[in-house]
Amino acid sequence: MKKNEYFNEIEKIYKEMSSHFKERLKEFKNIWENGTNKDIHLELSFCILTPQSKALNAWQAITNLKKDDLIYNGKAEELVEFLNIVRFKNNKSKYLVELREKMMKDGEIITKDFFNTLPTVAEKREWIVKNIKGMSYKEASHFLRNVGFGENIAILDRHILRNLVKLEVIDELPKTLTPKLYLEIEEKMRDYCEFVKIPMDEMDLLLWYKEAGVIFK
């Protein structure tokens, strides 16, 4: 394990931007601490829309669906009309409805209450991967980070993986990312973050910022 030239490059950005990363992560924690069941449900729904779609578009779609409460009571054929800005809109509209049905009790959304019954981050993530259609480890990790549980997990999208190759954390971009390989790369990233003394959730925002020039979600 070493700090290569590329690390020196991103370390400069980190020193300039670390206070912004910390502030953003604090905002994520506040979503969980102060958010309602519906707030947390929106965050989970957002991560269903993100695969192969821009995060900004996915969040815009969620914002539009929230306006008329469609996200909480609309049928799949109604939701799909608002998903033109994300890919795989037909499947994703069905996934949103299935998610809502799972997270509803006595006519009320219980998303935050439900996840509070799963004591660890690992248990929360495993439940999502096994029970929510359209969500793999990447999307589950994304959701958990966005509600303040990202200290020890990785969101291994193509931007992060490409940067892990440049940092020599992994040798090459994986052709497919199986659950086993995901966890192996996550462990390597965890070790590397410890080595360079940059918290894992801050490293994620740093590498995203390096690629996109923005700190979003």
Curated annotation (Swiss-Prot):
The EC number of this protein is 3.2.2.-, 4.2.99.18
Keywords, sorted A to Z = DNA damage, DNA repair, Glycosidase, Hydrolase, Lyase, Multifunctional enzyme
Q: Does the keyword Zinc apply?
A: no
Q: Where is this site: Important for guanine/8-oxoguanine distinction?
A: 217
Matches recorded under InterPro entries: DNA_glyclase/AP_lyase_Ogg (IPR012092), DNA_glycosylase (IPR011257), HhH-GPD_domain (IPR003265), HhH_base_excis_C (IPR023170)
Tell me its family: Belongs to the type-2 OGG1 family.
What's this protein's name? 8-oxoguanine DNA glycosylase/AP lyase
| Organism in which the protein naturally occurs | Fusobacterium nucleatum subsp. nucleatum (strain ATCC 25586 / DSM 15643 / BCRC 10681 / CIP 101130 / JCM 8532 / KCTC 2640 / LMG 13131 / VPI 4355)
UniProt lists the gene as: ogg
